Amino acid sequence: MLKRSIMTLYSGPLDIYSHQVRIVLAEKGVTVDIHNVDANHPSEDLIELNPYATLPTLVDRDLVLFESRVIMEYLDERFPHPPLLPVYPVARSRCRLLMYRIERNFYHSMKIIEEGTPKQAETEREFLTKELIELDPVFGEKTYFMNDDFTLVDCVMAPLLWRLPHLGVHVPPRAAKSMYKYKKLIFERESFKASLSESESELREVDGI
């Protein structure tokens, strides 16, 4: 493997896990060479670097990392400012658990909507709508999601919320005022806007923001 002089990210233009990492890179202001990859037809370069040929894959000189949360935590340690995880172990662990729960519950529903039968997809749309409405008070408790500072948890939550209209999930604004306020705050953040691929920008126009 050739040593690269600049950090390289193999990213899917519509891949939600790649989007997480792109937000972190933008938040940290890291110069990175982004290679857009079709996950169904990975390049030989990616296959050589990552035996699973999964996205995202990060190359930093001799280091190759895959799995979004591994990459995000590496970037947070490699570039400590601004910090995207709390200092104290208990708070850090809570953030990690939140990321796990968002992915296990909501990302799982997204996958079924995209790949399941029409009946399965509709069930998951109803589930996501109901869960987000019930979660609305939590969105209003802190400036960001369950924290006064922007964290990796927001880097996991934001890509999902961005994709809701594309997934056919329409949460009534009156039933989720705090969530819509949170979305507006996040979607207007410079790092989030910079993280969007051209394909992601085209996913949505306006969603009551």
Swiss-Prot record:
Residues 5-83 form the GST N-terminal domain. Forms an equimolar complex with the RNA polymerase holoenzyme (RNAP) but not with the core enzyme. GO terms for cellular component: cytoplasm. It comes from Coxiella burnetii (strain RSA 493 / Nine Mile phase I). Belongs to the GST superfamily. HSP26 family. This is Stringent starvation protein A homolog. The gene is sspA. SUPFAM superfamilies: GST C-terminal domain-like, Thioredoxin-like. InterPro entries: Glutathione-S-Trfase_C-like (IPR010987), Glutathione-S-Trfase_C_sf (IPR036282), Glutathione_S-Trfase (IPR040079), Glutathione_S-Trfase_N (IPR004045), GST_C (IPR004046), GST_Omega/HSP26 (IPR050983), SspA_N (IPR034341), Thioredoxin-like_sf (IPR036249).
